[in-house]
Amino acid sequence: MPFSTTEISTAGKASLDHYLKNNPIDQVALDRVWLRQLMKRKKPVPGGKQYVTAQVRYKYQNNGQWFYGNEQVTYNNRESLEQAQYPWRSMHDGYAISEDRLAQNGIIMTDGPGRNASKAEVLQLTNLLDEQNEILRLGTEEFMNEQCLLDGTQDTDAPVGLDGLVSLSPSSGTVGGLAASNAWWQNHAATGLTTTTTTGTILDKMEIAWRACVRNGGRPDFIMCGSDFLDGYRNFMLKSFGTLNHQGGSEISIEGGTKMVAFHGVPVMWNPSFSDLDTTYSPATAWEKRCYFINARHVWMAPLQGQDMVTRKPPRVYDRYVNYFGLTWRGAVVMDRRNAHAVISIS
């Protein structure tokens, strides 16, 4: 017994709504390290023109002065803010199910009134939609995670991501509409760190990057890196400073593996996506060799209100026997303090 066209369309939309309600897009898989961090701090904003804005305090203009008795003092007019503007962008992902594919799964669809589907057809349709909805969610996560890492030049309609916000060339170009030549609008960057046992510069450069972040915006609370950097840092620390204490005559247990790598008490997170970015884009400084120090208070995801992963049900077009289901998102990645972050890389 067949489903009607309307029943298929409504069932697909309802199942997608239900799936995302119980598996929201912000419960991102652990391997999407950067997207997961951004989603934890997301701040919906009202839509307006083409930009999401952030207030940037770039100076205090202090007017402190000493005086005695009836000496005259002065007052000043303070203008301490600039506005960073990030163009919001629109993302789409979706899937199509043709009548032929439904038929291959034992599901018949007609233009009739419907309401006559068998239990077997209902079960088959449910299984098919569950699979499609799951891979739609996972695919959207994969896409958003990658795009939010890149600098925005990969597509004219892409938002600026981490590579543009925390840049290896921090004084070049503009970020958020503000000139990166301003010293107060530059992240810390260092390349060519070495990991040779006892003589490597990696620990010194990490300390310098840490102090630069603390000086300008507070203690970094999120650190992520690629495989090469993680291995280099871990091996440098173990081979340069590692010891094994053993009392003679007693038995010991030796177990391999690294439970956690940290710096100043902050876990150093491995980002598996860095390898994919190297394969796809082959940047001059490999992602696998990079490490980012991030102050999460100063960078976040900013979806437009009412536009954060909206399920869509476009109508079936007259010359295609196909049903369409999709997701859309509109927003930007926003940063209000560049000098609170750092990027470093090994040679």
Model-based region annotation:
Residues 1-289, 294-347:
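Flexible, glycine/threonine- and acidic-rich loop/arm segments that mediate assembly and lattice contacts
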